[in-house]
């Protein structure tokens, strides 16, 4: 059960974080992953012969499953209805089932758009009359509606879509007939081509009525439909049976029945991006099949986590100024959207504008942001207490409590982790990405180099510009010596490499003079975290900017014991405490990666002894791992770090390292 929680809760936390940032597509994919992991856990319990859980655990997990399923359905409907509205489609409350047409993915096509663009999903409705319409499922922050009221956030733009727009443009007549309960037209991806065509005419007529009411255009006699659909004159239809898009209830500062029309902004064209094939998560979640769990019970969380777990919920520093995490609920035909938007809703548009890329270089940098990585926690790393405390002091505490770290307590903006290979430097950086609740940029030499003259410097500038727009950012550069190696006058260094180093150092220094945020008054929190196996190869100017230089040594005796115990925790072995103590003494001088390789090789020992009998032996009859298997593997797996290399690291640490 604990392993299920460790695998599911970080994904659920990432879904909440995406909702807080109004990334509906990312939240939808994360919720689908949560449901998939829950189903896998349930199937595993079935195979093990375990009965269904009862009591508080059952109620807690059932609530989690139903909540994720409901949110995923609402997010899917929100994204699809918003795109259909943007493509001038009007959906009826109940579509015909006579001519079902499935939704097919397109193959990736070659596009002239620059390569530095985010991934989106492109779908196509194949209609019976030969008319085709493409629907781009972009992120909601790129979706704009020509019916949106002024000074609204992205969620308000989505909410003021085709179904709700006429309700506040003009007073509608009361509907005497009982209200229709809108059905989800996307519960099954089968729709009628004739119904879609009729809905398109309704959308065109409603757009004509909106234009005449606001005084923007004289008339709309014809509408051009997307992708090879002929223009034809339309008449204004009734909207009593139309399905309204999901709406967000806002503050009612004015009466909803007031007939004064609102002014509208000019429509903003959407951003076109190249098409890519569907991912497994998004395609499996859009197949229209039932979401019921196959087993009679559902895998469970502890009762202390009511919805998605409070232990991994994003901190207040991340969700400050972000919208409510629940997707908009679907409104019926009588729902009336308020004309006024509260001040808090208006202020929520600023983070979206700040994080929107303004160039292809910023697109490339945003692709380096780690969002879907396997979480690593401090408890997963054995030993290295000094390094953990230094990282908490430099990253975790200042990012979570920025009001306490000001003036002389302002955190450092550069930290270097150096030491022999395989000691856990990159693992510490991954733990920082999980624990800090900050935007984590994983940068390598390939992220900042380009074959075009001057593009490398622009990529470096875009990296720091995007990082400064975030509330808290960590720029992790693995193998920093490949980017900021020592400069020399021997002529062996290329001019482009020298310009790249100079630009990186200049942008790094600009973090100190960055202007504070107008709302919070705090300067942007950006930390450059680097790791290297060759600290003596780093340029002196870069070494000065790394205020803290922490040495990551080889694991000590106690650390090796914890590491071996963790590796053998889920394995069938017959090692006693005395055997582990002897094994710890035999692995003197081994790094963390060497010990992991040794344990893997020893685990293969029982299988090697079986030989060809392995093909007919059941898993229960395989012998356990013993000390003799480890001793045999010690002759094969040797230490990767020499004593001369360790001595050199210790000398550099004495001269330049941060001693505690």
UniProtKB/Swiss-Prot annotation:
GO biological process: microtubule bundle formation; microtubule severing
Pfam families xrefs: AAA, AAA_lid_3, Vps4_C
Coiled coil feature spans: none
Ranges where the record places region Disordered: 141-186, 209-334
Keywords: ATP-binding, Nucleotide-binding, Nucleus, Phosphoprotein
Chain positions recorded as ATP binding sites: 419-426
Keyword Ribosomal protein: no
Domain of life: Eukaryota
Residues with Phosphoserine modification: 177
A GO molecular-function annotation: ATP binding
Listed Low complexity bias regions: 145-161, 240-255, 314-333
Gene3D superfamilies, alphabetized: 1.10.8.60, P-loop containing nucleotide triphosphate hydrolases
Biased composition (Polar residues): 213-239, 301-313
Subcellular location: Nucleus
Cysteine disulfide partners in this protein: none
Any one GO cellular component localisation term in the record: cell tip
Annotated SUPFAM superfamilies: P-loop containing nucleoside triphosphate hydrolases
Homology family: Belongs to the AAA ATPase family.
Protein name: ATPase-like fidgetin
Record organism: Schizosaccharomyces pombe (strain 972 / ATCC 24843) (Fission yeast)
Gene (name only): alf1
């Amino acid at each position: 059960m604990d392993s299920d929680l460790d695998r599911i809760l970080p994904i659920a936390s990432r879904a909440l974080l995406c909702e807080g940032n109004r990334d509906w597509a990312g939240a939808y994919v994360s919720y689908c992953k949560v449901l998939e992991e829950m189903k896998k856990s349930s199937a595993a319990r079935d195979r093990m012969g375990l009965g269904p859980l009862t009591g508080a655990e059952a109620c807690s997990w059932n609530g989690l499953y139903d909540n994720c399923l409901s949110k995923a359905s609402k997010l899917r409907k929100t994204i699809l209805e918003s795109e259909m509205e943007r493509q001038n489609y009007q959906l009826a409350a109940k579509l015909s089932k006579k001519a079902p047409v499935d939704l097919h993915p397109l193959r990736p096509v070659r596009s002239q758009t620059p390569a530095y663009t985010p991934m989106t999903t492109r779908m196509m409705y194949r209609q019976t009359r030969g008319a085709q319409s493409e629907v781009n499922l972009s992120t909601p922050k790129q979706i704009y509606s020509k019916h949106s009221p002024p000074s609204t956030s992205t969620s308000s733009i989505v909410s003021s879509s085709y179904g709700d727009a006429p309700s506040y443009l003009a007073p509608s007549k009361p509907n005497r007939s009982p209200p229709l309960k809108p059905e989800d037209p996307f519960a099954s991806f089968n729709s009628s081509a004739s119904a879609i065509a009729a809905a398109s005419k309704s959308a065109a007529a409603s757009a004509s009525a909106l234009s005449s009411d606001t005084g923007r255009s004289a008339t709309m006699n014809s509408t051009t439909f997307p992708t090879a659909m002929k223009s034809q004159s339309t008449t204004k239809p009734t909207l009593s049976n139309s399905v309204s898009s999901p709406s967000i209830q806002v503050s009612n500062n004015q009466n909803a029945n007031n007939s004064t029309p609102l002014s509208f902004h000019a429509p903003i064209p959407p951003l076109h991006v190249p098409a890519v094939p569907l991912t497994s998560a998004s395609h499996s979640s859009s197949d229209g099949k039932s979401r019921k769990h196959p087993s009679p019970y559902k895998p469970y969380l502890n009762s202390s986590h009511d919805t998605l777990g409070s232990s991994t919920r994003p901190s207040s520093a991340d969700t400050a100024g972000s919208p409510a995490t629940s997707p908009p609920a679907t409104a019926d035909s009588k729902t009336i959207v308020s004309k006024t938007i509260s001040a808090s809703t208006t202020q929520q548009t600023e983070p979206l504008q700040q994080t929107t890329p303004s160039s292809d270089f910023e697109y490339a940098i945003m692709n380096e942001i780690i969002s879907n990585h396997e979480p690593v926690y401090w408890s997963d790393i054995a030993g290295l207490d000094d390094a953990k405390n230094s990282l908490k002091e430099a990253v975790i505490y200042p990012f979570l409590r920025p009001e306490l770290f000001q003036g002389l307590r302002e955190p450092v903006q550069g930290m270097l982790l150096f030491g022999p290979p395989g000691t856990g430097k990159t693992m510490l950086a991954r733990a920082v990405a999980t624990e800090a609740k900050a935007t984590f940029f994983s940068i390598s030499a390939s992220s900042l180099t380009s074959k075009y003259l001057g593009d490398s410097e622009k990529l470096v500038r875009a990296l720091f510009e995007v990082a400064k727009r975030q509330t808290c950012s960590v720029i992790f550069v693995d193998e920093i010596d490949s980017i900021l190696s020592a400069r020399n006058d021997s002529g062996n260094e290329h001019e482009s490499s020298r310009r790249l180093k100079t630009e990186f150092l200049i942008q790094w220094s600009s973090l100190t003079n960055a202007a504070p945020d107008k709302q919070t008054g705090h300067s942007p929190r950006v930390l450059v975290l680097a790791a290297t196996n060759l600290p003596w190869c780093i340029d002196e100017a870069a070494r000065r900017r790394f205020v803290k230089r922490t040495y990551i040594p080889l694991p000590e005796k106690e650390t090796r014991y914890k590491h071996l115990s963790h590796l053998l925790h889920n394995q069938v072995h017959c090692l006693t405490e005395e055997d582990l103590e002897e094994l710890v003494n035999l692995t003197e001088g081994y790094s963390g990666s060497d010990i992991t390789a040794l344990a893997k090789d020893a685990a293969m020992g029982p299988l090697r002894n079986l030989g060809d009998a392995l093909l007919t032996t059941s898993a229960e009859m395989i012998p356990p791992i013993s000390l003799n298997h480890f001793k045999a593997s010690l002759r094969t797996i040797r230490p990767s770090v020499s004593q001369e290399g360790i001595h050199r690291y210790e000398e550099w640490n004495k001269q330049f390292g941060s001693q505690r």
